[in-house]
Amino acid sequence: MTIEALGQYKILEPAGTGALGDVYRARDTRVGTTVAVTVVADEIASNPEHREQLLRYARASGAVSHPNIVTLYELGEDAGRLFMVSEFVQGQTLKTIIGGRPLNPRRAIDLASQIAEALADAHAVDFVHGAITADTIVVTPKGRAKITDFGLAAFSTSFPGAAGTAQGSHRAPGDSSAQVDLFSVGVILFEMLTGRAPVPGAGVPSAVNRSSPREIDPIVARALGKNGGYETAATLAAELRAVGALLDVRQEAHDAAAPPVMSRSKPKRSYAAWIVLALILAAATAWWYFRFV
């Protein structure tokens, strides 16, 4: 059945499938803004326990406001359909951007830093994602990472086609809330640096992709559980930013040390200009001489 509107939201077009059900691009007819409307799947909406979980999620999301987390606006119901309204984000999923190929290391570190900083704010109020993958990260045209489906891990296997929690053959060491999120950042960072998800025995990113800077290897290894993993997302974010700054300084030093490139065409153009000028002066002199002498 085609859905034309839900409450004050006019449905414009399908936009994909999320952890809860089908997602649509819609317009808020009261204020004119574009939003994302998720129609909650019947198997979730008809389950009293799941409904209660959604209400808890909606209340918890109100405590988190971060530019790298998709904002939830409303959880409503219209004509028996349960729906969720959230910020509409234009961009591509990180999974699509990677496409089986390594990203520029500096870009990968920047995106991972954004994700970790968002998690730091969320974890500070005990709000955990629980199922972060490259599919749940949308990157805007301006390069901002936006975490989607935040707090919906409980539904990730409830709806066919929804993003799951599997991360290759790797698994987080234990199932302790925030630690799962930090482990997932390590998985995503490895995938961005190498073009593929880590598997046991894969080694560090620089061993898979020689263009990946070795300075990032200890961070990825620790995030994936070695040496006890990271205790907080804030610590992970700080270390990522530090490595990013180091790479920036190194690049600036490299650019400053590079000899200036001299264009050989400029002298030729300069000589040609002088020749043309000389010919013009000679012609003018000849004209003046034969005119007045």
Task: Please describe what each predicted stretch is.
Residues L119, V138, T148, G168-E252:
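C-terminal lobe helix-coil module of Hanks-type protein kinase domains
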Residues G16, R56, V64-N68:
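Flexible N-lobe loop architecture of eukaryotic-like protein kinase catalytic domains
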